[in-house]
Swiss-Prot record:
This protein's name: Citrate lyase acyl carrier protein 2
Family, per entry: Belongs to the CitD family.
Organism: Salmonella typhimurium (strain LT2 / SGSC1412 / ATCC 700720)
InterPro entries registered for this protein in UniProt: CitD, Mal_deCO2ase/Cit_lyase_ACP
Subunit note: Oligomer with a subunit composition of (alpha,beta,gamma)6.
Cellular component, GO annotation: cytoplasm
UniProt keyword annotations, A-Z: Cytoplasm, Phosphoprotein
O-(phosphoribosyl dephospho-coenzyme A)serine: residues carrying this PTM: 14
Its job: Covalent carrier of the coenzyme of citrate lyase.
Amino acid sequence: MKIIKDALAGTLESSDVMIRIGPSSEPGIRLELESLVKQQFGAAIEQVVRETLAKLGVERALVSVDDKGALECILRARVQAAALRAAEQTEIQWSAL
């Protein structure tokens, strides 16, 4: 999946996460993480974001994660929504999700 424009998903409310994703000229996923629980769960949050993008076939992107204590299922859903919006996908491959 090719990221072609900037997109966001989520909110900055408690127990949610705001995901911003945009195109990158360099290969790979560049990830910026801000979280209330970064010391304790930062590595796990980063792993979930990278795994979710890999399942969707995203190979290059700039990703910003502003976490306010979201559960893993919420994090995955927000990453998926932002990536699909950024790729302007109209036909969703549900099996990949």
